[in-house]
From Swiss-Prot:
GO terms for cellular component: cytosolic small ribosomal subunit. Pfam families: Ribosomal_S17 (PF00366). GO terms for molecular function: rRNA binding; structural constituent of ribosome. One of its GO terms (biological process) is translation. This is Small ribosomal subunit protein uS17. The keyword Ribonucleoprotein applies. Keywords: Ribonucleoprotein, Ribosomal protein, RNA-binding, rRNA-binding. One of the primary rRNA binding proteins, it binds specifically to the 5'-end of 16S ribosomal RNA. NCBIfam families: PRK05610.1 (NF004123), uS17_bact (TIGR03635). Belongs to the universal ribosomal protein uS17 family.
């Protein structure tokens, strides 16, 4: 990696909202060790991501990568859909 080349952050999560045009909300869960008790606790973050073709649906597992700010809350882009949700 050169001096002006950055590594791109990517996260995998589940789509919890696709109601906006060209945007999705992705829930990313991680496990963190509690500093005092040592138990692993689930922590989650909701990321607003750009979905250019409106191809994601609620329940899909997707991979997103960090990008420049696209709006007030949106600074992630959809990379690919890992797994489609089952149709009910």
């Amino acid at each position: 990696m050169t001096a002006n080349e950055k590594s791109v952050r990517t996260e995998t999560g589940k789509v919890v909202s696709d109601k906006m045009d060209k945007s999705i909300v992705v829930l990313v869960e991680r496990r963190v060790k509690h500093p005092l008790y040592g138990k692993y606790v689930k922590r989650s973050s909701k990321l607003h991501a750009h979905d250019e073709n409106n191809e994601c649906r609620i329940g899909d597992t997707v991979q997103v990568q960090e990008s420049r700010p696209l709006s007030k809350t949106k600074s992630w882009k959809l990379v690919n859909i890992v797994e489609r949700a089952e149709k009910v």
